[in-house]
Every structure is written in C-alpha cells, then in structure tokens.
Amino acid sequence: MATSSFNINELVASHGDKGLLATALVDKTTHEQLEEQLQHQRRGRKVYIRNVLGVKDSEVIRNRYGGKYDLHLTQQEFASQGLAGALRLCGTLDCLDSFPSSGLRQDLVLDFGGSWVTHYLRGHNVHCCSPCLGIRDKMRHSERLMNMRKIILNDPQQFDGRQPDFCTQPAADCKVQAHFAISIHGGYDMGFRGLCEAMNAHGTTILKGTMMFDGAMMFDDQGVIPELNCQWRKIRSAFSETEDVTPLVGKLNSTVFSRVRKFKTMVAFDFINESTMSYVHDWENIKSFLTDQTYSYRGMTYGIERCVIHAGIMTYKIIGVPGMCPPELIRHCIWFPSIKDYVGLKIPASQDLVEWKTVRILTSTLRETEEIAMRCYNDKKAWMEQFKVILGVLSAKSSTIVINGMSMQSGERIDINDYHYIGFAILLHTKMKYEQLGKMYDMWNASSISKWFAALTRPLRVFFSSVVHALFPTLRPREEKEFLIKLSTFVTFNEECSFDGGEEWDVISSAAYVATQAVTDGKILAAQKAEKLAEKLAQPVSEVSDSPETSSQTPDDTADVCGKEREVSELDSLSAQTRSPITRVAERATAMLEYAAYEKHLHDTTVSNLKRIWNMAGGDDKRSFLEGNLKFVFDSYFTVDPMVNIHFSTGRWVRPVPEGIVYPVGYNERGLGPKSDGELYIVNSECVICNSESLSTVYGRSLQTPTGTISQVDGVAGCGKTMPIKSIFEPSTDMIVTANKKSAQDVRMALFKSSDSKEACTFVRTADSVLLNECPTVSRVLEDEVVLLHFGQLCAVMSKLKAVRAICFGDAEQIAFSSRDASFDMRFSKIIPDETSDADTTFRSPQDVVPLVRLMATKALPKGTHSKYTKWVSQSKVRRSVTSRAIASVTLVDLDSSRFYITMTQADKASLISRAKEMNLPKTFWNERIKTVHESQGISEDHVTLVRLKSTKCDLFKQFSYCLVALTRHKVTFRYEYCGVLNGDLIASVARA
C-alpha cells in the first residue's frame, strides 16, 4: 500500500474550514468503515404504528419522532387513545436508544411498569418490573400472554429459545441489578422520590422516562391536553364531580373514592369522547416531577432533568451520583404558555363580599367589555341598569354568532356558574375607576379633610388605610388590585442541593474502568457480529413467503448479503478504444452544435408561444396594455397549460400561483426576461425554469470539443450504479455530475449525508449548474444517470471542466433523453462511449421480475435486438412480488403512506393527487410519494403501485423503456391497478402471465 505524501493534520491546520479536500477524505473513510453498522441501525429504526391516526395526529408524531425513526403509519386498526398509544411506543424506543443495546448483561435495562411483551417480541435486553396493583394490571398481563402466544405461533423459529424477562414485584422490591432504567408513564404511582428509591435498590445510575405534562396543573383544578385529547381534573373529595350521579353508597364502596376519602388530592385523566378506562393518580406524585429537583437517599444524590416537552408528553431523565455534593443553587422554571392571553379577575364568592376567588378571562374580552361599559356608564342610572348593559356586552363577546350563514365563536365561553359574578365584578371595577378619576378631579377643590389626608406622609396614609380596611372589610374590594390579577406565565423553583455522602467520587478512576470494560465488550461483540455475518454470507438465497405483501427484512438483508458483490468495480472489464480520434471529435462537435441549436429552438418556441398569447389578449410590441377579452383567452389556454397566468401592475395575479412556484421571467411588450412587481406581464410553464437561452450561448464561450475518454457502465436496473461512484470518487481529481436536481440530492445524501452542505454542493452538481456557473477544473467526471443527458451536453460538461476522462453510469435501455419539441430533428442525442461495460446482476428487483422483463423485451423489442435483460439475474431474496387488480375509478385506489405511487401520464398523477387531498393526506405524501414513471427513474422503494385510470390510447404502455422503469422501482412488492382494458398494455400482459 502506498504511503500518503501529505499530512492530513497539517493540511487541516493550514487551511482551516477551507480544507474541503481533507474533510471529504475523512467523510469518505468514515463512510466506508461504518457502512455496515449504519445499515444495521437503519433496520432497527423502523417503527410500525398500527393505530388509525388522523392527519393532525400523524403530523404530531412525525414532528416528534419522524427524524429519528422510519415511521410506518399502517392505519390498520382503530384503537382507543390512538395517538397516546403511538407516542408511548415511540417513547419506549426513544428512551431505550439512550443506552447501549449490546445484549450483554452489564448493559441490561430495567423497565418500571412497562409492557414486557413489547420487549420480548422485539428482542430487547430489558427486565420489566410489572407489579399487579389491581384488576387492571392483571387484565393487562392476561392480554399480553395471549398476544405473545398469537405472534409466536406465526413464527416459532424466531422465538425459539427466547424467554420473557419480567417480574410482578414492585420496583423497589425487585433484586435485579442494572445501570440503566426506563419508566414510560410509570412515575405517576411512584413519584420522583419513589423512582429514586427504586433506582437505589437496583443500583441504577441513569433513568429515562416519559409522563403526561400540563403546567396548568400548578394553579388550575382542571384542564385539557389538546394534542392527546385528554381532560384532567383534580378530585379532592368523593362529592366533587357533579357529573357523577352514582348513589352515595356506590361512591363510598368504590375503589377510587376509598382512597379519596383519606383527603388525598387525586388527578383523573379522561380521554374526551372515548368511553374507555380512565386513569387516577396521586397529585403529590405528579407534582413532584414539576417541583422537585434533587433527592438524597442512602449515600446517593439523584437529580432530575426535564428534557423535551412536546404534544403534552414530557421526557425526563434522573441521574444518580455517589459521594459528597457541594452546596449549589438549583433553579428551574415551569412555564404556562396557555395563559399568556388571560387576566385574573376576582369575583365574589360570598354575599358579604368578604370571600373572593380568582377566575381567568380573556384579556381582549375584558378590555372590550369594559370599554363599552365605560362609555355607557351613567351615575344617575340604577345599578341594575348598569348591570344589564355590562351583561349584554359580556354575552356578545363570549357567545356564538352567525355571519353569512356561518357560525363563529366570539371570544371564549364563560362558565355558567360564574357568568353573573363576572359581570358584577366588572360593574364594581368600572364604578371604582370612575370614583378614582373623580377623586383625582376633586383634588383641585379638595375639602379640609382631603387636604389633611393628603398632607399626611405616605407611611401614615398606608397605616390609616390598613386600619380602615381591617375594621370595615366590605371596603376591601374598593381597590383596583382586588379585581384584576396579573397571571404569571411561569413559576420558578430554587433549591439548594448539598449532601455529605462520605468519600469523594473518583470520576477519573471510574472513567478509566468504563473505557477498559467497553473495549473488552466491544471486541466480544465484534467477534460475534463477524461470525453471524460469515454465516449469513455462506447461506444460499432462501425463499420467503409467497405473500406479495410480506416485507420481512428483505431490502436491508439484501444489502448485507450482496455487499461483497457490490464492491467489485465494473470498470475492470472496460474494452479498449476502437474508433479513430478524428471520428470521435467530429461526433462530439456535431452533438454540441445540435444541443446548442436545440436549446435555442426551445427558447424561440417559448417566446413565440407567449407572444401569440399576448397578442390574442390585445397586447402589442409598443404598449403595456391588455383588452377586456383576456379572461376568455387565458381560460382557453389554461385548459392546456395550467401555469398560464397574468401579473398586473398592482401585484395581483389572475389565478392563484401554486404553492412553491416562482416565475423568474415573464413576457410583455419588452419581450421575455426578468420583470418587476409593478409591471404587467404574462407567464406560462416555460417561465418557471427558463435557462434555454443561457445554455444555447454557453457553447460560444470558448468551449472546445473534448478529446478525453468517455467510459460507460451500462448496468441493469438495481445493479448498484451509485455504489461504484461512491467507491471510486476522489475529491482531489473528480466531480460528480447528475442529470437533474433530484439525482444530485440523492448522491449528496449518500456521499456526504447532507444535500446542501458546502462540500456536497462543491463536488456534486447538475449538468446545467456546471454549464451556467463558475466551477473548478477537474481531471475526471463521474456522471450518474447519463442516459438522461444529451450527448452534446455531456461533451460540453467535459469541455467546461477540462476533464480528460468521463466515467458514465446508466441503463441505456431505460428512458433516455428525449426532445421536448417534436418539431426539432434530433439526431445526435444518444451517448456514444469509447469504452463500455455491462452489469447484468440486480440486487433490487425480486426474482419474479426477471422473467417478466424478459417477456416484455421479447414482445416489445424488434426481432434481432440485443438486450442485456435477456440474461440478467437477481440476487434478491423475494420470490414473488408482482400482483395486479382491476379498479373502477380513482376512489378505489388504496392510498397508503408506506407505498410509492407512479403513473405513466401527468393526468393520472393529477387525479391521484386530488384524491389524496380529498382524503386529507399530508402534503408530503402527495408531493413525494406520487410521481410519473419518468420522474421516478433512479428511485428505489420497498412497495410500489402503478396506477392507470384510463383505457384510452397511451403509447407509453407499449414502450419497453417506460414499462421497464415502472416494473423495476420496487424491492418487495409491486401492484398494478388499472381501469379497463388497454390494447398493447405490456405490464398487464406480463402480470397476468
């Protein structure tokens, strides 16, 4: 192995953040070393959620865990507390991911109150403490036993020799020792201190858990957690719930209220509109997670950290440390963002006006009610008349109103029991303000008593007022502060933590011991992993279930089993050059001229079409003016091109601009080009990406015909064309060029784990980006999906980069570059390589796809045509994957977030997108999971559905290239759903064969 001629450390030190070469080399080396481990981790991060979730609930769970797990929302079954159950599963996996998952005994994890069957079925190294505290716990144990039996019967070999690891003792009584623990909604019955004592009994150092959280519990008696659709209420006695009409004897004999009778405050969690089991827990235990910070117990000090609060679920961790703890002030805040728009209003709680209570009311409601009441206030009116005015205004600001046949909520509804008291408090508050203002006015002509009182010093005035208030309590509400209370949006807790636990903890020695132990355990795990990999590689390709919907572990296992074959470079068998250099240069020069003429033709066609529309609408080449018939003209063109639009000088568009669409250019009397917001102009679909004129002029900027070698690796679909690019890429000499932006983003993510970083955008660019922008020169170009490029475009890229070698990857039999204008005579678009190599082994396509593609090639290709698909083979484990079914309309298409949908035409794609919008599916689904066959070239998915919604003539279903792309996008299942019979449909003919 050759010795490196430069020092990486010196290179990075000298260039700093500009050392792209060193950064790219480190990324490349790291990727090669960790590729197999990352594949294993990706398999473990797939989470299947069977509960049926609405669009809003799906967004909640994707926002919380979508970046960490590969979520599969299968929408299989309705379940009570659907979102809460899904969050509980993801929360369990999230907490487990915080700890080592080696399977070694020293990495055992405890679960206080969790579901042991979940860990058993997933093979987690977890011991569950699942005590039977009541009938509900015993019911759960029985249900878990039956679920375990049902799953084992379906796949007994997977669970052979595996035993569930759990006990029915309380967490503090269990003797199993472990460094790590989790508690998923298990802290309600234990409290913060109870969890700390359980950790001490188990020798646990770190615990991570989750619980439902609402900061309003600190000051309210009831509230709602909207994301979980859960209502909570504090219960202080057996008679506090007025909705409960159970007889008194039944209440006193019930299990819940037998505890409540002991004057404990309980918190009941009820799920709204779900007549299911509720949960009742001790308020002191729940409050401890909000107020407590540390707890010292038997030589250990435990501290809690509140990590993430999202969707009404708080994730926290408790860490225990031994030895002495120096004094330290620990501070934390509990925030109440839900009350920022409210103000506290004191209302009478007794007729003698001595006892008052505080209620919350919207600041806007109080302000508007008081404003109108002040204007209508008249001291000569009876107090009842004033009261009626205030109640009328208050009712209007807190009731449902109807506008144009639509009901709207004005303000916020007020409790029926407090409604009149709130109005009375506002009346007193209004009268008090008038009196205060009157006193200020009377100060100019004050009496002798007023002058004497004003002459007193402030301490004497305060003392005098206090004596009067004490002797005459009914005068108390005559101060403003007794009516309006400013509600704080947070509560602060300060706690001084110190503990004398004896000797000081030697952190340095502990770190050395943990590091040594981890190295030893890592070697053991590496040896075990190597043995398993060797056994897997030695096994022949085995047959899986005949069910087309069975996903198993096929996609990722295929990557592991076939990893060795993918590392073999297809470049080793490239043939030598056989054509004359003069002939090659002439072909390339001709292709470059043709591509320049083609782009110029597209630009001229765009200008001609826009000019025709402009003139038909009444415009000309001299003035910016359109006549009244423009609506008829644009409505007619809109049926052909939905992107046709008019921009007026006021900034208004005739039709709403689709989301995400920007028109950089437009057309008016000054021609086609960039326009300002104050201009009148028209646009069409060609104005979204209008670079044809720039591309046509690039070839005149001293671009000479390249003389370097063009090598092409012509591989079948799924042969792993991206892997060789990653393996042979050298940042110092290479640049990766793709045909479109989507391919560039995929390569950047595969190579740099980022699609927009500086390094990724420097080394991976589209062909148009290279031609239109400044770029460094390189000696070698790596071209991905080269068949989508015009030959002249490839030659121009080589000339611009001054490359002496172009290594091109692509399938010559898939969809190639095609002219967007049928009137242009295209002759030199096909790539003419100097060296070629074939790759006939696919790692993506299942076994049954191979004969189907052969049959399609026999039917569609002319006789005597040589196709590499006549001898291609598959290394996939999946035996059967292709199914088909007839449907009556688009409403019968089963839209599932786990599947990828493709169509041959844009019309069918638009119909699917409309159907997805009707079903309220997320925007990401119909933006990313529905594509045309042309748009999906280069994409690989587990489950693919091809949809044909019309039986009218469509030549694309007769073309081998389009049908080939459609049938080779999947790794596990392919479903063809079609409406009616279409003559010459290749896919339908082979799917039924």
From Swiss-Prot:
Residues 713-976 are annotated as: ATP-dependent helicase. Its EC number is 3.6.4.-, 2.1.1.-. One of its GO terms (biological process) is methylation. Gene3D superfamilies: P-loop containing nucleotide triphosphate hydrolases. Residues 683-839 form the (+)RNA virus helicase ATP-binding domain. Belongs to the bromoviridae replication protein 1a family. This is Replication protein 1a. It comes from Cucumber mosaic virus (strain Y).
